């Protein structure tokens, strides 16, 4: 049986001035689903980085589109960010930029690739697919807070 979910799909021009619209939409969706404030802030950074990577690298001189799909599941939010621009080898880039040595000063960190490192750090799961363009699938699970009533855990989650 297929897992039940709701889907929200958006398309924006691959321009920096539209990234805030996606970030605000995602924050509203995540808030409605019951995500904690810190998790919403993490997802805002991750989706901004994914969209900014497309704006800076995917289309070069041409102006293309960014497709964003939110998959709202009971226990998680899946965010797909896709373009039809120039793609790159994520695994090769990942080897070049991470992991980082915490003893090195910030000045010695590489300038490129930090966005993908941030996304990988802030989200629970990330998948990169590249055929015609690049697709980034990010997943964040809802952390249910629990309180106890007479020794029995009670979820503070209210379903939407």
Curated annotation (Swiss-Prot):
InterPro entries, sorted: Anti-sigma-factor_SerPK (IPR050267), HATPase_C_sf (IPR036890), RsbW (IPR010193)
Pfam families: HATPase_c_2
GO molecular function annotations of the record: ATP binding; protein serine kinase activity; protein serine/threonine kinase activity; sigma factor antagonist activity
Sorted UniProt keywords: ATP-binding, Kinase, Nucleotide-binding, Serine/threonine-protein kinase, Transferase
Top-level EC class as recorded in UniProt: transferase
EC number: 2.7.11.1
Reactions catalysed: L-seryl-[protein] + ATP = O-phospho-L-seryl-[protein] + ADP + H(+); L-threonyl-[protein] + ATP = O-phospho-L-threonyl-[protein] + ADP + H(+)
Function: Negative regulator of sigma-B activity. Phosphorylates and inactivates its specific antagonist protein, RsbV. Upon phosphorylation of RsbV, RsbW is released and binds to sigma-B, thereby blocking its ability to form an RNA polymerase holoenzyme (E-sigma-B).
NCBIfam families tied to this protein: PRK04069.1, rsbW_low_gc
PANTHER family linked to this entry: ANTI-SIGMA-F FACTOR RSBW-RELATED, SERINE-PROTEIN KINASE RSBW
Family that this chain belongs to: Belongs to the anti-sigma-factor family.
Protein name, as recorded: Serine-protein kinase RsbW
Protein source organism: Bacillus cereus (strain ATCC 10987 / NRS 248)
């Amino acid at each position: 049986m297929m897992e039940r979910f709701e889907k929200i799909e958006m398309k924006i021009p691959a321009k920096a001035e539209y990234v805030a619209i996606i970030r605000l939409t995602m924050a509203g969706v995540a808030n409605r689903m019951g995500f904690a404030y810190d998790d919403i802030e993490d997802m805002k950074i991750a989706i901004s980085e994914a969209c900014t990577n497309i704006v800076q690298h995917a289309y070069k001189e041409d102006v293309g589109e960014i497709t964003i799909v939110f998959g709202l599941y009971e226990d998680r939010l899946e965010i797909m960010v896709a373009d039809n621009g120039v793609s790159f080898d994520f695994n090769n880039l990942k080897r070049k930029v991470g992991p980082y040595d915490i003893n090195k000063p910030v000045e010695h960190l590489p300038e490129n690739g930090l966005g993908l490192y941030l996304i990988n750090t802030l989200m629970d799961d990330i998948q990169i697919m590249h055929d015609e363009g690049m697709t980034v699938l990010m997943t964040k699970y809802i952390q249910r807070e629990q309180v106890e009533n007479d020794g029995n855990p009670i979820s503070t989650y209210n379903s939407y």
